[in-house]
Amino acid sequence: MTTRHRSVCVIGAGPRGLSVLERLCANFRSQPEPSPVHVHVVDPYPPGPGKVWRTDQSPHLLMNTVAGQISVFTDASVDLSGPLEPGPSLHEWAVALGAGEFGDGHPAEALAEARRLGPDTYPTRAFYGRYLRWAYQRVTSGAPAGLTFTTHPHLAVALDDDPDAEDQTLQRVTLADHTVLGGLDAVILCQGHLPARADAAERDFTARARQAGLLHIAPANPADVDLDVLPPGTTVLLRGLGLNFFDYLAQLTAGRDGTFSRVGGRLVYHPSGREPQIHAASRRGIPYQARGENEKGPHGRHEPLLLSAERIARLRRTHESTGLDFRDQLWPLISREVETVYYRTLLTSRGYTAEAQQFQDDYLAAGPHQRHTDAVIAAYGIGEKDRWDWDLIARPYRDREFTGPGDFTGWLLDHLREDVAEAHCGNVSGPLKAALDVLRDLRNEIRLAVDHGGLHGDSYRTDLDRWYTPLNAYLSIGPPARRVEEMIALIEAGVLHVVGPQVHVEVDTGTGTGRAGYTVSSPLVPGSELRVDALVEARLPDITLSRTGDPLLRHLLATGQCTAYRIRTRRADAYDSDGLAVTARPFRLIDAAGRPHPRRFAFGVPTESVHWVTAAGIRPGVNSVTLTDSDAIARAALICTTTAAATVPGAGPEQSTATTGTNPPGGQSPTPRQGLTPAH
């Protein structure tokens, strides 16, 4: 009898796929006398950087996380079932690279960046890609005996049970070049942001723009867009003022040989003459807030005062039958946590250190009622102008009536300068940025509360998806302060103009005038109406299963082998989230009948809605959830190589309710800490 070769396929070889590969190696190494396993790595782009972090992209594109807070390796903080095999963070690797520890042959620009990169410096995306490429080489070259790898530089277009295998639960992956990988024991989907087809409203808008002969650039990663279609002097609207906006802005200015210099401490832009005339707008009308300068080091974080893991577990148990309501059960805790840090830091900044700690105790003890918290604030002499106001922070122009574009631009420049000054105060010493950084630090706790149906469906859609997630992005995941300084300089140089809030954009076909264009205006800024020749959607494609442009997910959806995650509401129906449905950890893929597949796993961006903020990267020293997830998936996949599908934990029909959010918080299939023997 011929022994069957054991194999695993990892689809997507960016940071998440790389983490799974590292965990496969670590867990395989810990097995006593394991049988050989071959790993197929499928990605049309180089493994490690993948598409998003490829090393040939513009040096003007930056990460929005500092170098000391970026890693792909496990560390002592991570709650692993598998073995710990630490490696360097991005900054630690850069120090070693700059010192010549990795030999010769590295490009001069990479060595130069390595030598100037500090732990609190924002690296270029291409440099992070070099780190990921090195990490992939380290992981695969140091793999244990018996674990081998083959890379396939193609898209995966289909995943099916293998009809030719003796055990027909084994898997078959078909690639775009018609290669078929059969007899697979496990397949792990580690995809990132994927292309998406336009919805009905977007299709109608695009069709009208095309009919008028207008240029319209759809949502995309700015690094992938050919901006040569925007010649110098073209009037263009960047619709969106988030992170993608800053990427486009950099490529259309510094990327076209414009330069910045310091003049009397102020940043000044010197145009090259090759820039388009840039206009920008969004619903909020102002850009994401600048990140506070990091004072927390690589591993520091705000430790929860109210939203602890224990409290979340109690809340989920109490509301297990109905699901939590974000506004009622979670937002009061999040908001008080942020406010407490703001006032405590404000008092500390004024020299009242002892009083600041007592204030924290009193404010937390006051409970959620504003009458009580206002009394505490007044007792500590905090005046009205220093009071925390969520609505004003979300809409800082709330109390303004603008008289025209010049008035709005003047106000905006003052707002941006104040934001930069607040960022320079730091994320520990500065009251505003210290408070906003709490939102970033609480992401893991919020995930514990909302993941896997923690909220009822109506609250997920209305409170989390449409309200808190965009607010959190605006307040806590913005660009480095330098980017906002550059924006100020570009406005002052006349290269950039921001239209205003609640922008309206329409296609004017030119009937009667002979000149087509986009008309743009803000109802809050009188006289803001203008016309542009081109429109760039400055955002990433939607995360959507029903409209995905990925051929693999389209195949799985069309054949009923995957389904959208549905979250129960407090009525008889469920909210269709349009995210990819998976079980609780280790995240087995669920089919249209609600059955988890014993040999298929998925995590990352396509599972948004099962999990929250899936695009967040791996951070060292804070028990990164991505690392614990990849460890659990790798262990489950290795169990598949040693066990018949019928005995794989979690393979039975008992998890079929996972698509309606009824699986337990933090639930997972058994993965024993020692070895990989399946649980019984």
Predicted regions: what is each one?
Residues 47-110, 597:
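Redox-cofactor-proximal catalytic regions of oxidoreductases
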